[in-house]
Amino acid sequence: MKIIVTGVAGFIGMHTAKYLLKRGDDVIGIDNINDYYDPDLKLARLKEIQKFKKFDFYKVDIVNKDEIENIFFKTKPQKVIHLAAQAGVRYSIVNPDKYIQSNLMGFANIIENCRNFEIEHFVYGSSSSVYGGNTLLPFSENHSVDHPLSLY
């Protein structure tokens, strides 16, 4: 199975890719290695999964529509696990444009390519921040998410 994992150099992305590779899947990793978190940490994570023969990595920002489309065209994945996003709740309040680009436009690029290339299965990893002003604890996937507090 060929699976794209976006945000592959992040903590969850690396562990997801590693699991899939150990299972025998082909993994196409995408990450922009931005400097919000230490890039050396991201590169160390990548080094750990680049040992696998069935791993291909693309250093690409998911906002880059043409490059994302080329990756889908070239690799012909069957599934996509979308974990890439600009991190940081506080940072999103100060820098909303970065979040609009990555977390909205980047998401749109990924989901449109999933539609255009007839991807069998799409998994989107989000954050508890989607529950926004919800006062119910613990959060549940059944709770309303119509009162966001930030773009994150």
Predicted regions and their residues:
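N-terminal Rossmann-like NAD(P)+-binding domain of SDR-like oxidoreductases, especially those catalyzing
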Residues: 1-152
